[in-house]
C-alpha cells in the first residue's frame, strides 16, 4: 500500500505545537470495557477514546479531551476517534448531508489544522468535536438513535469473491450485500485496490448534491492519516451505505440523476489514447466556461470529449470546470453553489489518485457533467443572485496596502462580498503572493465558523487554488470570497472554550 501525500504531510506535523505526543488513555474498568453486541466494535486501541466522545456530555467534551491531551493523548488518536465516532453514531440517511456533515467535515478540519499556525492547530479539531455532539443528538431525534451494527460475518464473501460481490451489489443498489462485500474486500485487498473500485461508483449520480464523492475522497484522505489497516472497515462500510442512498429516486437509466454517469462511461471510451498529452489552450477554457452556462449534463460530457480529442490539455478542461463552479457561487451564493466547488474538489482528488486510465477519463467527464445539475438545482433556490461572470470581474484597488489591505478586504467581506472579491483581484495584481490572503481566510474560519460548510468550503477552495492554471488562479480565489468569512462580528464561544481548555 502506498502512502498518499496527505499521510506524508501528516507524519511530518504530528507534533502540532508540542501537544501531539504519542500518549495512551488511562486503563478502564471491566464494566467500562464491556461492549454492546448490537454495535460495531472498533480497533481495541481506539475503542475507549471513541466511547469517551460518545458518552461525554457536549458541554464537557472539549475540556475532557484537552485534559487528556495535556497528559499525552495524540492528535492522531483524537482525529481517528472523531471520525470513527461519527460513522458509528450518525446515519447517512435519509440523505448524505445535514447531520452527517459531522463525518464529512473531519478531513476538512484536519487539512485546516495542517495549514494552521501552531497556536491555532487544535481549533478546527475542537470545532469538529463539538459538532459531532450536535450531530449525535440529531441522530437520536431523527433516526431513533441509530448506531452502526456489527457486520453479518456469516455473509462476508471469501477473498476471491469479495471484489465481484461488491461490484454486483453496487450495480444492483443492494445495501445489505454491499455491506458484507466491502467488509470482505477491505480485509483482503490493499488500500489502492479498494479505493480504485470506489472511485468508479461514488460520483456516478447526483443524489445528495455531491456528498457521496465528497465522503469517498475525505474518507480515503483521512484514512491515510489515521491508519487504513486499523480503521478502514467501519469507515468504508459507512461510505458504501452512503453511496447507496437513493433518496426515493429509483435508480435507472432514464433517471436524470443517473443518466449522465452511464452515458459518460461510454463517452470515456471515445477519448483518444494520448489524451493526457494535449496542449494548454486558454481560449478553449474560456469557450468551455461559456458553454457551462447553458449546456446539459450530457452535452457537457460530449464537449469535453471533443476538446480532449482535439488535443486540448486536461488542465485546460479543469480550468473551465473550476471557473464555472466559481462563477456559479458568484452568481448565486448558497448551499447548492458552494457544493459545486466542494464536489469538484473531491472529484479532482479522485482523478489525481486513480490508477486506471479509463476511470480517470470518466471522472473528468463526471466533473463537467455535475455542473449543469448544480446550475439547475441552484435555479430552484431563492438565494440572492448577481449578474456576474468569472472571466470579466473587474479588479478594484484596496485603499490600504500590504497587510492593512488584507484587513480591509476581510472587513469588506462581512458587508459587501462583491467589493471584497474585486479587491482580491486588485490586491493580487499588485501583490502576487496569495499567502497573506489565504492565511487570513483560514484565521477567520477558525474564529467565526458556525457551520460545517465553513470548513469544507474553505479547505477545498484554498487547496484548489494550486490546481488552477496561473492565469485563472486569482479569479478563482476572488470567486471564493462569496462564501468565505469576513472579520466582522465576534469570535465564536468555541474559540474561547478551546483556548481556555488547552491552557497550562
In which residue ranges do the predicted regions lie?
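Mature, well-folded catalytic/scaffold domains that follow N-terminal targeting or propeptide regions
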Residues: 2-504
